[in-house]
């Protein structure tokens, strides 16, 4: 680690406030260097944090945290906040099992005012805190820090609309770096970008009036000044929109300040001190650069949004001399991306929709090959789903590529706008199940439960990569709303067909014949079920579909076996195991059933294999649980 004499003095914001304001730029440099080194070792969100260093220092320098509340939106940019609030020596554990969470977490620190992981929640949460303080007679201040990408979500504007009508002391800091994870899309980011240059017409008139007479007396000066004036007028035409930023937020009832350089920490301190003394809703528009201070991240903030590990800058810029690695087995996301392009090449009706997750959802190639049929709607999951419904009404075949955890945000639209109207929209539900380092806010553990109760829905869960392609093709051709949910990362390594074969909807398949015990497995749990079944001589059914579920297969297995074990990487409550129990009850079958899924708990973060073992869903844990269950039953009999 590089020496950091100022940063080493800081264990809390109280220590930070003892520094002279002129020392803060140096502190920012030390903090940024520390970030480069710590994230380089552990991995994690990177470019967003580099861009928020000065802003974080200034906020903690001015505001009396933890008494005053800082509410970070999404949390990608919260690492400097964690470093300054007593967690610097734990940063090497970031996103690791038993270590620091990658996002603000209330149970981790009193400085983490609100837990977060999804976008656009900060203004509403900070507004609630400000309203509570008013009712309690407290003079605490609440601050929401939100990126311009998160401002594309309707929830942010719902909160702005509400806040402007309430007499509360609230500061919203708009951290404008023209990025979310991918480049921002939509009218609002363009609107904000047009307002970075301030209105210069008044300034130009003043300069001309004051200096015109002097310039007339200097040979050649007037001609030069006229050229400068032309350049300024060109900028001024764009800057006419600057007044609109003020108008936009002031029409919501906020007093607008900005844009302000988000990397000038001393000026930020002065501005924030002024804003802290003001009453009522305030909005500070700060301009930052994602990846600031690390050229590779500045030049490619999408690639460096999050990193597994960080090469030295000099090494990263050199051509690799290593032998190319053999091609790894494809991830489920890559299987989906290839299927989508193959299907689109054969069907001009196919359109793809993503809520600001082009890279993560595997849509980069699709956008390049079919730009007219690609729609990135921004961080707007609700709109994405209803938009897909409108496309389906006119004969298009929409495919919504979305993470399981983000589909939760559009549940009403899925029910009201898609399912009740039986519109043929396919949801490619990525990151189903445990996701690892991102933790509980990003885990996809509830989709089977909340999808299978929705009328008209088809819900499928592939057990390997080829099954993923089969089920995508099958559900795409269904004249009904459908969801195919698949996990993060790679699968079993099954060879993937290039064809568009389909399977019968609502029918499972026996993967292994055994005796006495039947494993009824869904999706990613088929592989561990097969591993355990080899040791216990059990039958394994790959159900493929959670809805419609294969009642005939379940009844046949129940009548030909002594006991049943269901396995799913989803919440036990309301999940696929519950669907099996419903079938047994419907047919009056009473057999011992062991449900294996995620218990009613908040999961942790870290290595997915370790998390699955803790949840009792790794192959080793499944074997232990099943053997213990069988032993208990034998003892009882």
Swiss-Prot record:
Keywords: Isoprene biosynthesis, Magnesium, Metal-binding, Thiamine biosynthesis, Thiamine pyrophosphate, Transferase. Pathway: Metabolic intermediate biosynthesis; 1-deoxy-D-xylulose 5-phosphate biosynthesis; 1-deoxy-D-xylulose 5-phosphate from D-glyceraldehyde 3-phosphate and pyruvate: step 1/1. Binds 1 Mg(2+) ion per subunit. SMART domains: Transket_pyr. Mg(2+) binds at residues 148, 177. Its EC number is 2.2.1.7. PROSITE patterns: TRANSKETOLASE_1, TRANSKETOLASE_2. One of its GO terms (biological process) is terpenoid biosynthetic process. It holds the Pfam family Transket_pyr. The keyword Oxidoreductase does not apply. Its cofactor is Mg(2+); thiamine diphosphate. Homodimer. Belongs to the transketolase family. DXPS subfamily. Catalyzes the acyloin condensation reaction between C atoms 2 and 3 of pyruvate and glyceraldehyde 3-phosphate to yield 1-deoxy-D-xylulose-5-phosphate (DXP). This is 1-deoxy-D-xylulose-5-phosphate synthase. The gene is dxs.
